[in-house]
Design a protein with these regions (language model features):
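Basic, ligand-binding patches in group-transfer machinery
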Residues: 1-203, 227
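Active-site and donor-binding regions of nucleotide-sugar-utilizing enzymes
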Residues: 54-55, 73, 82-84, 93-97, ...
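A short, charged/proline- and glycine-enriched loop
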Residues: 195-204, 300-302, 369-374
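Conserved catalytic-core segment of nucleotide-activated headgroup transferases in glycan assembly
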Residues: 214-229, 360-437
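Short, polar loop motifs at secondary-structure junctions
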Residues: 241-247, 428-432, 470-471
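Acidic, amphipathic alpha-helical patches
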Residues: 266, 412, 454-455
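A donor-sugar binding/catalytic signature common to diverse glycosyltransferases
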Residues: 288, 306, 450-478
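Nucleotide-activated donor-binding/catalytic signature segment of Leloir-type glycosyltransferases, i.e.
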Residues: 436-450
């Protein structure tokens, strides 16, 4: 090998690409160079209730010494959990067996990558565990691999976009059972048999966050369709919601056009629909953070008209919702020329794909505040780095400490009393499970659980909004 280093930070390595008699170079941080031309090929995966055994094969190289096998936490602040492993050496290869016992690991939500730590040229390198065929991807589609990982939690393996092995750790879900896989296979079979008929229906599926809400742009779009379109025009427009959700009461009058979330009909229509219309991304149309799923992979390929759930102006959403982001849209509704310019310039959509439509939920927004009820709405937005963390980690966050301190402030309670005002603390839906951790001081502060009262009704009657960088400010301003 030939090595060049630039100020000790970048390694330049020439190599022959696939034996095609050409020379290429790659510039990477030194600790990632070995991973460019060395593969830890996954040969086999064995599973039991709480353990996963991974068998890997790696070509031996002069000067390369394996030091460790770890699970690496995927986060801005990464840390490693050592994994038990064995190594056998043949003439040309290392045979590495990694033993992962998830019950014994102190895991955090969400993503963990399997890495081999090796030393070469005095530099510690990390080598990813890679799949070399689609066999395991297909295996994950058909099987129900998951591992117990402590009380109320589980982890499962998945195939990353780069073809590597990773694990997702989260709370248990009612959709983790093998019955979900059976439902997926049944729906797939029905779809294949009746695809021409189902496609002719031109089905539209409308939904909101987690398919558990009916109070955002998706709901008002659906309501408009039900009340203003002809029977022929609306006959194949459906709203997907969990009928156990409180908001179901608002739309049950349209029950012929309501589909129960995660029912066989839902899974079948997810495959059959020609368009999704939603205030949230495609991931909200299916079981949240589901295991490797053939249905979930099909959802990503269906057209979607994104109604948005907040004006795009305060947050950089390009990496997520941009045309080349992780969750791109087919059509992207905007509320003004100003917002359309942002979506076109920074998210890379054409004007035709980002029409100025306004928000359907704004059709019902009006000021219903009264002098007799001086209501203040306190609604901060969520924090991506705190999504689905444990209660213990959430309680340590600055977010919790600051808002908890405010809600228990005697000075705030005194101010509210002096002005005969009251305050509602409405936590973001993604933090709904953490509301139980907050306490308040006085009777003039109310902690409203997600779904108990429609947010737009609270906004309509509030005198003042206090927020950070939540797009809810645009609704109140409107």
């Amino acid at each position: 090998s030939i090595r060049f280093y630039e100020e000790g930070e970048v390694a330049v390595v020439p190599y022959s690409r696939n034996g095609d008699r050409t020379i290429s170079i790659v510039l990477r941080k030194p600790e990632r160079i070995v991973d460019e031309y060395t593969q830890a090929k996954i040969k086999k995966i064995k599973s039991s209730k709480n353990t996963c055994t991974v068998f890997m094969k790696m070509r031996r190289q002069e000067g390369l010494e394996i030091k460790d096998v770890v699970l690496r936490y995927r986060s801005a602040l990464t840390y490693d959990i050592p994994v038990k492993y064995d190594i056998k050496k043949t003439e040309k290869h290392y045979l590495i067996t990694a033993y992962l016992n998830f019950d014994e690991m102190n895991l955090r939500e969400l993503y963990w990558d399997l890495r081999i730590i090796a030393n070469k040229y005095g530099i510690e390198n990390e080598i990813r565990a890679r799949f070399t065929s689609n066999y395991w991807k297909n295996n994950f589609y058909l099987t129900n691999r998951q591992y117990s990982a402590g009380e109320g939690h589980m982890t499962f393996p998945y195939y990353t976009k780069g073809g590597c092995l990773a694990f997702l750790y989260r709370q248990d879900s009612e959709y983790d059972a093998y019955s979900t896989k059976i439902k997926e296979m049944a729906a797939s079979a029905i779809y294949v048999l009746f695809k021409p008929i189902l496609k002719r229906k031109k089905i539209w599926l409308v939904y909101e966050k987690f398919c558990s809400m009916a109070q955002d742009n998706g709901y008002y779009f659906f309501k408009y369709c039900m009340e203003n379109l002809s029977e022929e025009e609306k006959k194949n427009i459906y709203y997907v919601i969990d009928k156990k959700a409180p908001d179901y009461e608002k739309i049950k009058e349209y029950d012929d056009h309501i589909i129960q979330f995660m029912s066989l009909k839902h899974v079948l229509y997810v495959l059959s629909a020609v368009l999704y219309v939603a205030s949230d991304s495609r991931t909200h149309l299916y079981a949240w953070r589901c295991k490797t799923s053939l249905i979930r992979s099909k959802i990503d390929k269906r057209p979607i008209f994104f109604l948005q759930h907040g004006v795009t102006a305060l947050k950089q959403v390009g990496p997520l919702f941009g045309r080349k982001g992780s969750s791109p849209m087919t059509y992207f509704a905007t509320t003004s020329q100003f917002e359309q310019d942002i979506v076109v310039k920074y998210l890379d959509y054409s004007e035709g794909k980002a029409p100025i439509t306004g928000f359907t939920r704004w059709d019902v927004l009006e000021d219903t505040s009264t002098k007799d009820d001086k209501l203040i709405l306190l609604m901060p937005t969520w924090r991506s780095w705190l999504e689905e963390v444990s209660d213990e980690d959430f309680l340590k966050s600055e977010y919790y400490k600051n808002y908890s301190s405010l809600l228990q402030s005697e000075r705030l309670d005194k101010i509210l009393e002096e002005h005969d005002a009251r305050m509602i603390f409405y936590i973001h839906p993604k933090f709904a499970g953490y509301l139980k951790n907050f306490k308040k001081t006085g009777e003039r502060i109310t902690l409203v659980p997600f779904g108990e009262e429609p947010l737009n009704e609270i906004m309509k009657k509030c005198h003042l909004l206090i927020t950070d960088y939540s797009s809810v400010c645009w609704d109140v301003y409107y």
